[in-house]
Design a protein with these regions (language model features):
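Structural signal for beta-propeller blades
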Residues: 8, 46-48, 96-98, 147-149
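Conserved beta-propeller blade signature
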Residues: 38-39, 88-89, 139-140
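Loop/turn-rich, solvent-exposed surfaces of beta-rich toroidal or solenoidal domains
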Residues: 71-105
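Short loop/turn segments immediately following the C-termini of beta-strands
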Residues: 3, 35, 43, 53, ...
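Gly/Pro-rich loop segments of beta-rich domains
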Residues: 4-28, 54-78, 105-129
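Blade-level signature of beta-propeller repeat domains, shared across WD40, Kelch, NHL, RCC1
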Residues: 126-155
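Residue-level detector of Asp-centered blade-edge/turn motifs that repeat once per structural unit
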Residues: 32-35, 82-85, 133-136
C-alpha cells in the first residue's frame, strides 16, 4: 500500500453483497496485522474473514457455519483483535460473549467473557461491540446495550 495515496485501494470484498469468499455482507469491524493482512467481521454472514495482502478473495477464520451459538458459530460478530501469536478475539454481539480462536484450534472457539444470558451483571454482556487490550493483557469490551465499557483479566 502506498503512503499518501489519495484514492482508495480495494483490499477486501468489492464484489457485491453476498457470502462468497470474495464478498462481504455488512462488514463491521477491521483489524490489520503487521503483515498488512486484513481481518473483517462479516456481520450478516456471521463469520470473520482474513484477506492476505494482495489477495482477490479471503478465507474464513472464525464462524461461517450460519447464525448460532455453538462454539463453531457466531451471531453478528463485531469487534475483532489479533495478537502477535495469531490468536483471534471476537466480540460475538448477538450471542452476548467474547470468543477466542487459537492457531491450534481453528474449527471452534472458546468463550472467554459472557456467554451467559444477556444481562447487566459483571459476568454478563448485552451486545458487545468494540474490544481492545492494554499492555498488561487486560481485555476491554464495549458493552453496547449496557452503555458501559468493562475490563476483564483473562489468561
Amino acid at each position: 500500500y502506498q503512503l499518501g495515496e489519495k484514492n482508495g485501494t480495494l483490499v477486501a470484498g468489492g464484489n457485491g453483497e453476498g457470502n462468497g469468499l470474495n464478498q462481504l455482507n455488512f462488514p463491521a469491524y477491521l483489524f490489520v496485522d503487521r503483515q498488512q493482512n486484513v481481518y473483517v467481521s462479516d456481520n450478516n454472514n456471521h463469520r470473520v474473514m482474513k484477506w492476505n495482502k494482495g489477495a482477490k478473495e479471503g478465507f474464513v477464520v472464525a464462524g461461517g457455519q450460519g447464525q448460532g451459538n455453538a462454539l463453531t458459530q457466531l451471531y453478528c460478530p463485531n469487534g475483532i483483535f489479533v495478537d502477535t501469536l495469531g490468536t483471534l478475539y471476537v466480540a460475538d454481539g448477538g450471542n452476548n460473549r467474547v470468543m477466542r480462536w487459537t492457531q491450534r484450534d481453528k474449527k471452534q472457539g472458546t468463550v472467554i467473557v459472557g456467554g451467559n444470558v444477556r444481562g447487566e451483571g459483571a459476568n454478563q454482556l448485552s451486545y458487545p461491540a468494540g474490544l481492545s487490550f492494554d499492555r498488561e493483557g487486560n481485555l476491554y469490551v464495549g458493552d453496547q446495550n449496557n452503555h458501559r465499557v468493562q475490563r476483564f483479566s483473562i489468561e
